[in-house]
């Protein structure tokens, strides 16, 4: 009955799950048939893949960045596969450019876990140019108003969306896609 209602009326997953909750309540509490209530499955929303930016779109995005710091921050996020919070929290000491290592240390990433990610030669060159010009001391991307603090996540997101709009990129998604 429920499956027929779903297919006929093209119900949203949340609506379907409300009906499932009502049925589970009815079977479990009203009828006392817990076993039947457990077997009614919930509807799951399909997982959508994010829209990935092409190389040409990435080049336009980096070119549209407001300044060298923002450009290098965006390049680091994309080249190393970092979340915005991770790239903002990078310290100069987290960059290991030794030829036998070439990695970036991510401290307290998703789930509070530390990890290492690859440092490509092209990103290393961009980071060296940035370092020579901006000379960051502790934080790789410090705040402009207070160098003792890391770049603010919301400011990084704003900078990304501004660059995306300036570059004429219409794909949806955030800095992490």
Residue ranges and their predicted role:
Residues 1-177:
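Conserved catalytic core of the tyrosine transesterase superfamily
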